[in-house]
Amino acid sequence: YEVISNNSNVKTYPKDIYDSLISTLGDNIKKEYEEYKEEDQSFGDYLYDEYGYKTIDEFDKWSEEYTQNYLKQMMIVYIIAYENKITVSSEDIINKGNEQAELYDYNGYEDIVTEYGNEMNTELGYSVLYTKVMDFLVSISIGE
């Protein structure tokens, strides 16, 4: 994966996913700030105290780099899966959902989907696909 990543040049990122990830990172840090801030602590001070970002722009720059790296990884995983006919079944997604449900005290896959919506199928499916691709890469590297 690292060799592929280092030799890849991404020209564009899927705008809808990119924008959604940036928005989610911002929303999550703002929610965290509201929950854990000290009295009279500004958002900028919270970012510095908790994460070491000197400015909000510095956090935004990190968010952009993180999102680009995540999407690059995702695109590489999809390409490797496609080229090697690695697939994910609905049973794989349900099993992963049940694992996550147990980990986070839900009654099962259906509870997670009910709480977070059908987009969880995409998240769970990608998680399974990522694991299968990494297992595939390990298997071919061991054979060399």
Please report, for each region that a protein language model flagged, where it lies by residue.
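Extended, charged alpha-helical "arm"/coiled-coil substrate-binding scaffolds
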Residues: 1-144
